[in-house]
């Protein structure tokens, strides 16, 4: 809802970066279920944790939004988890997907990383 140019968010669910991170985490989870069994508990487990960490750190940081520096710290953790997820996806793509079929989701994570970076800058410069 917009009132006089300000955006009011009732919950972290209203944040575009959270919504995108949540959607991508679900896709990564489903993707890992198609990996060979020996990868389910190693590479698969690691990427499931890193992809879910993105959304979870956004949510936890939003819960501390009253404390700007805490909020920023959790958003930075989220961005770092996004980078980790991209690294994991690249490894899985190179090992298990010779057709480079994960390039699309890798690009979506790059977009999420850019959006997180812009949101971090917004919070740093505009959050009261």
In which residue ranges do the predicted regions lie?
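Amphipathic alpha-helical assembly/interaction segments
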Residues: 1-128
């Amino acid at each position: 809802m917009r009132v006089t140019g300000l955006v009011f968010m009732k919950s972290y669910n209203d944040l575009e970066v959270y919504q995108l991170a949540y959607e991508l985490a679900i896709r990564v989870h489903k993707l890992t279920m198609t990996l060979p069994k020996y990868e389910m508990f190693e590479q698969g487990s690691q990427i499931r944790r890193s992809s879910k960490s993105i959304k979870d750190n956004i949510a936890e940081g939003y819960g501390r939004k009253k404390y700007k520096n805490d909020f920023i710290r959790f958003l930075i953790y989220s961005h770092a988890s996004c980078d980790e997820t991209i690294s994991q996806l690249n490894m899985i793509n190179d090992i298990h997907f010779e057709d480079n079929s994960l390039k699309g989701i890798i690009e979506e994570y790059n977009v999420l990383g850019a959006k997180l970076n812009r949101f971090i800058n917004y919070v740093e410069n505009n959050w009261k």
